């Protein structure tokens, strides 16, 4: 097993929470982990680059960890041991619904419980729920903390040949790639609206016959800015 930790960044910026988690993960997994970042504003291009690097290397897995995510390394070990081709850890949106938090605070005496119940999460489970060893099958999940086996990219390359192109002369060629698998390019929903790169990726994998599993019984942080604004 050899895992490439892939992290898209904006101008190379990483949060301290991300860095602390990555150091702990390296301590847990040792030399089984390599690390690669990208820098830019287009997430689909960044994720395409990292996926394509796996195909042009001997890595068995790609572990997406976004630069604003923190997590316990034991969670990554659980995801590895679950041994599914694609598994994601669920994290909250970086949004505070003040009205919902106010309602939850009135319903719960524990402030932490009120806070947790006021958040929304980046996933949609299948209905009815399908569970295995504490993991649930999902329609989609965010790719901010997602473990993907090499076979997923090989399958998408073979079943979607229009997505696999020579990289020469492109952004991807400048990243050192010979070919690029553009599996994160946005798809369009039934209304003709572009979907996010992570939802599009999940849908492509499921259209190829794959499954997505998620775990949400561990604590994952999604770091973001918050402006404290008021009059004293």
Q: Model-derived features: where do they sit?
A:
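Conserved donor sugar-nucleotide recognition element shared by glycan-biosynthetic enzymes
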Residues: 43-47, 119, 198
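Conserved catalytic core of nucleotide-sugar-dependent glycosyltransferases
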Residues: 51, 72-185
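C-terminal catalytic/acceptor-binding lobe
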Residues: 1-4, 158-232
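Residue-level recognition of beta-strand->loop/alpha-helix junctions
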Residues: 36-39, 90, 216
């Amino acid at each position: 097993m050899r895992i490439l930790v892939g992290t898209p960044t904006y101008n190379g910026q990483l949060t301290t929470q991300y860095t602390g988690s990555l150091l702990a993960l390296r301590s847990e997994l040792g030399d089984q982990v390599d690390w690669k970042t990208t820098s830019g504003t287009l997430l689909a291009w960044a994720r395409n680059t990292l996926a394509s690097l796996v195909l042009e290397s001997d890595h068995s897995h790609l572990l997406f960890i976004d630069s604003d995510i923190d997590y316990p390394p034991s969670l990554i070990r659980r995801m590895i041991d679950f041994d599914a081709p694609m598994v994601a850890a669920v994290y909250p949106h970086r949004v505070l619904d003040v009205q919902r938090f106010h309602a939850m605070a009135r319903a719960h005496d524990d402030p932490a419980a009120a806070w947790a119940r006021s958040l929304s999460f980046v996933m949609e489970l299948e209905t009815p729920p399908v569970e295995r060893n504490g993991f649930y099958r999902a329609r989609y999940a965010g790719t901010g903390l997602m473990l993907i086996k090499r076979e997923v990219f090989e399958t998408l390359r073979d079943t979607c040949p229009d997505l696999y192109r020579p990289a020469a002369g492109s952004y991807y060629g400048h990243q050192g790639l010979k070919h690029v698998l553009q599996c994160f390019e946005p798809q369009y929903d039934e209304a003709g609206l572009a979907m996010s790169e992570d939802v599009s990726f999940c849908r492509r994998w499921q259209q190829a016959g794959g499954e997505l599993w998620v775990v949400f019984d561990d604590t994952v942080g999604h770091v973001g800015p918050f402006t404290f604004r008021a009059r004293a």
